[in-house]
Amino acid sequence: MNTQVKLFLIQLLFDKKITFFPDINNQKFWNNLVKISSSQIIIPTVYFKLNERGLLKKIPNDLKDYLFEIYSFNKKRNQSMVNEINSIHKILNDNNINFFFLKGSYLLRTIYKNSIGIRMMHE
């Protein structure tokens, strides 16, 4: 079962053709998906990709609600970080201080700027 879940996640996250889509009532599969996604800190990304690929209607409603709740919370938290980063950016620029952002701070302002909810940050 875990092999199927891992294959599903790889295909989902890397925009590959999904060769196996579990039945909506396959509770064991969906529970394992949550466990693996949680352990890899990718639950918001899983929600985002399911939504992006139009697959949310094919998963259990309680799972959809759970994934959305985590995605939404993460998006709000990341937006708060972006606001703080922008404030720091302005202060440093106003004082002619050379700087650059690293890690999550950089990623939020560049790579993830149009979808800030997909990556969990811990900086």
Please place each PLM-identified region on the residue numbering.
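Helical scaffold of the NTase/Pol beta-like nucleotidyltransferase catalytic core
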Residues: 2-10, 14, 18-103
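Short secondary-structure boundary/hinge segments and terminal tails
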Residues: 55, 110-111
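Short, solvent-exposed loop/turn segments at secondary-structure junctions
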Residues: 106-108
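Catalytic metal-binding acidic patch
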Residues: 113-123
